[in-house]
Amino acid sequence: MPCPRLLAALFCSSGLFAASGDFCDSSLCLHGGTCLLNEDRTPPFYCLCPEGFTGLLCNETEHGPCFPNPCHNDAECQVTDDSHRGDVFIQYICKCPLGYVGIHCETTCTSPLGMQTGAIADSQISASSMHLGFMGLQRWAPELARLHQTGIVNAWTSGNYDKNPWIQVNLMRKMWVTGVVTQGASRAGSAEYLKTFKVAYSTDGRQFQFIQVAGRSGDKIFIGNVNNSGLKINLFDTPLETQYVRLVPIICHRGCTLRFELLGCELNGCTEPLGLKDNTIPNKQITASSYYKTWGLSAFSWFPYYARLDNQGKFNAWTAQTNSASEWLQIDLGSQKRVTGIITQGARDFGHIQYVAAYRVAYGDDGVTWTEYKDPGASESKIFPGNMDNNSHKKNIFETPFQARFVRIQPVAWHNRITLRVELLGC
């Protein structure tokens, strides 16, 4: 077959293709491009180029807002117009994979938000109804709907005559919510659980909208559990920026009985534990104004470095020597970090419940000069609400995060003795 004229003729004369005229025999396409025949046209072939390359032979680097891909974690970069985005990153958006958020999908966002640990308080959980069992003495109340809750009455169950049941959580501020983990329970010896459910959300607690099916109209129906004890994880196609999350049972096995956890992260995306619980921060970097010895015995000391969230053992927290507002616990982060929040926890001393009920936070870079945290526009340092028992987590997020190496916690109110286990959040 004679060579086509012009460009194809150049390839002919250069001997880059077989005598039979099959232009794809010589693998003309560069950078892993795929050669496809384009018979009866000029040129008689074309190259299907991999991402990032263009040109007749995939010999040119593709340019544009998505090349190279600015998105992280294998997110898809989508070219758009300036009117689609209101921020400085014009011409593209990043479509995040499940469990990631951020302008560039840079933040992993699947942390438990506090149902299981108690960081979400009982008062933040409400429902359309609840079941009253055993002559009204058993309250299957919404505040029991915590993942892995134990006991004879250990979950939320809707009322017998509730035709449109729901349970909701008020997160107290806008957060990213990326998924939910559900679990059933056993009631009167029988397994009960949600087989399917919907998820609604709201920013004001009054007007709710349901998560929709991706790419189609209609409310999304999530698949729930198949027994009373197993866990079912559902991640949302699109993260929710919301304050209220409502689970609406659709099909229930025997009764609408639920334990659950919400997954997500703070909007600022900088809420990773800074190293107290996992011992990344060494003992020598955790100090205090004093520490208590039960019965005055050194063997029964409540050292500062015991003040790690969820620490276990007979002596598993820091306790101050005196109940005085002059006492403090100090953490040296080792280098300057962005600190966005704190989680506190109390402990027991031979059966006596002890915790810090309120405290201030101070910070600095040299361990000598301190700045007490204040809310924006406030003239007085902020007093943070602390714990109400010895074991639950209490999370406080700083409205204005700060940069610091040293963080000091200053108790101002306590129950029995000043006792703390703690984790700092940030990045």
Curated annotation (Swiss-Prot):
GO CC terms of this entry: acrosomal membrane; extracellular region
Signal peptide extent: 1-18
InterPro entries referenced in this protein's UniProt entry, alphabetically: EGF-like_dom, FA58C, Galactose-bd-like_sf, Neuropilin_MCO_CoagFactor
Keywords, comma-separated and alphabetical: Angiogenesis, Cell adhesion, Cytoplasmic vesicle, Disulfide bond, EGF-like domain, Fertilization, Glycoprotein, Membrane, Repeat, Secreted, Signal
Disulfide bonds listed in the record: 24-35, 29-47, 49-58, 66-77, 71-94, 96-105, 109-265, 252-256, 270-427
Parts forming coiled coils: none
Domain notes: The F5/8 type C 2 domain mediates high-affinity binding to phosphatidylserine-containing membranes.
Name of the protein in question: Lactadherin
Organism for this UniProt entry: Bos taurus
